[in-house]
Amino acid sequence: MPETRTPIISFKNFSFQYRAQKQPTLHDINLDIYPGERVLIAGPSGSGKSTLAACINGLNPFSYPGKCTGTLTVDGVDAPHSSIFELAGHVGTVLQDPDGQFIGLTVGEDIAFALENSCTPQDEMHEITRRAAELVGIENHLDYAPHELSGGQKQRVSLAGVMVDEVKILLFDEPLANLDPATGKQAIELIDTIQQKTDTTVLIIEHRLEDVLWRSVDRIVLVNEGRILADLRPDELLSGALLAENGIREPLYVTAMRYAGIDITPAKHPAHVDSVVLDDADTEKLRAWFRAEPLPAAKPAPTPLLEVKGLSFGYSKDQHTLSDVSFTIGKGEMVSIVGRNGAGKSTLSKLICGFETPDSGEIFFDGKDLKDENIRRRARHIGYVMQNPNQMISKTMIFDEVALGLQGSGLTDAEIRARVEDTLKVCGLYPFRNWPISALSFGQKKRVTIASVLVQDPELIILDEPTAGQDFRHYTDIMEFLRGLNAKGVTVVMITHDMHLMLEYTPRALAFCDGRLIADRSAAAILCDPALIEQAALKETSLYTLANRCGITPAEKFVERFIAADREVRADGC
């Protein structure tokens, strides 16, 4: 039956070409979004999904000039011929990096910023600010400064700041990118709650499909190479192969069902692991696959490389960021460090690298006490890649940034050039070697910082959120590269919120909570332990839920067998 409602967003034969580019980024877009809908816009990096969003909120063409053809109407406004100020009254945008959206010195000031600009009377402004803060659950933090908030709290403030204008459209740009799994889950729940209370139209730009589908969406719009490839209900899209063909990871439980030979159709409602239809034959197929799939071979215990003994640290006398932490990481291991924001994970890496000095405890590297080793000497053996690439980058050009750490190393200019170019190739940056870093996306900048550390051939690499901002293809490229380094003997430690990464690439994980090490187990075992998941603010894998639904025990063995099988399938290029 044809749609009779009037769309709140309507693209008709719409194309957009940035002024600095020779070809359009968006080609002949035809898309209608209706009031009150919740739509996920998915696509790999560079697909055009962010450009599509920027046309809706007015960043294109008003902040980033370009040529528009066709028509785009947003809440009755001719968007390309309007203004960014006018569109801001219709579309509220929550950015990927909430720090980039903060303006006020306190939460209250930040939320009230738009009201101040419109000269709202003070009493009315206070009341609107209070209501917006209550709506997003941040009403008890109105006097807090931005640096006193967690990542999830900052995102709530950003959301409240756009809600004060009573916009009809909310646009979320990768809302899960910088959040721990539990907070990401809460963010999706918050978006769901806000939409139900306000009947706002919600657009979510995200490639972490399974995490977004924690709550229902009406449609998924798949974008690649500047074109809309699909506009389907989740059950329809998950039943086909379009996601995999376009570099978007389907939910793990869906992949497991495919491996077991289950025919996935829209009638099975595959959009949610709790409600996917599994008849007796499907359940038996999954059990038979589990019985037939061999367990990955156990590896011998490695020789210790990094030993941490009784480590404690606080940024002030009455604040204990880390308390009595002890563990050993062996040569050639690949280990993940997980836990909620503020659990002490990044602080631990700073202590290992020498950026901070522990209050008590010892750190040994290859049997040597590091207490007398300064940052520079430690950096010869231990490489560290920060979560925010902008905090590491100091050069204008990509090649110069990667080469910086080799200056004064005794290598000739030719040797430096060869090593830098080799590293850029394996990081997928060689075509951009002469580009300015300012022209790169957040994810591309991340790869530059990884390259700048890898070029120095460290024995141990610590990476803080190595795949943040990466689509599935680039995620796989980086992780396979790191796994290749690991296979050559380089020890890799990753601080991560990505449960897929934890499962796929790190046989062992260290889980932290409130500055304490609460688990040192296999990644699969941790993600199949509900109590531990809650304590460490993780998110149980959907494979655990699927195993339980099929009566497969122990669930962690099902998870381990799936990960081993999936790696083999992807290695074969299937």
Task: Show where each model-derived region lies.
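The feature captures the beta-strand-to-loop junction immediately N-terminal to the Walker
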Residues: 42-44, 338-340
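Catalytic Walker B motif of ABC-type/P-loop ATPase nucleotide-binding domains
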Residues: 170-173, 461-464
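Conserved ABC ATPase signature
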Residues: 145-149, 153, 436-440
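Conserved beta-strand-loop-alpha-helix hinge in the C-terminal portion
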Residues: 227-253, 516-543
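Helix-to-loop junction immediately C-terminal to a conserved catalytic motif
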Residues: 57, 353
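Conserved ABC transporter NBD signature motif
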Residues: 65-77, 361-369, 378
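Conserved ABC ATPase "signature" region
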Residues: 123-141, 414-432
